[in-house]
């Protein structure tokens, strides 16, 4: 076992920062899972997760703090006919990542199979073409209480987060189309005047536009191409824009 990684725990899944480092846990039926840590220059350090409970691989890395970029590589059989496409040349996102940084750069590097032979694994490394998960500090428990509206009295307003405040004259320009814009007093007052009791947001998970849209200079405005269900879409962050 590498001295840089300890057994850790199988729960919770994802990256969990604590006083002794960060615990990484991911579910995979593969033969080996490798944690990939990236520095600010993109240099990669690989650590094999040392423990497995059922199909959950896990390890605790001392010294890893919030802000660390990471991903996984998984070894196993490459048998497309049997539904198995393990390929350690491909960097994988943590499905439980709570933040994702970077963009998908479409190209042959993202293909799991060789470009000239779909039955053979691709040897091209995909790390430079993939976004990475971001280790976050544990968030404090919410203190605000929710309104106790009866279901029969509820008025649910479905809204696209960016579109709702993109042109609102009373929301500051730097906040329009962001989470902070939706939470701005002017936006909330507008909802209250309408009699709305609950807001249902269209997709706010981290998403990417499809390749054919990018080729046409377009984007997936609605966000229905999620790559991380636990990571808020960074493009809606006012802080990320600043």
Residue spans of the language-model regions?
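Carboxylate/His-rich catalytic cores and anion/metal-binding grooves
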Residues: 191-218
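Structural beta-strand segments of beta-rich domains
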Residues: 20-24
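The feature marks proteins involved in alpha-glucan
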Residues: 1-19, 44, 52-56, 63-158, ...
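A conserved hydrophobic secondary-structure block that centers on an alpha-helix together
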Residues: 162-199
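Conserved, mostly hydrophobic/aromatic
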Residues: 26, 72, 159, 191, ...
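Short proline/glycine-enriched turn/loop motifs at strand-loop junctions of beta-rich domains
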Residues: 27-33, 64
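Aromatic- and acidic-residue-enriched carbohydrate-binding clefts of CAZyme catalytic domains
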Residues: 171-181, 211-242
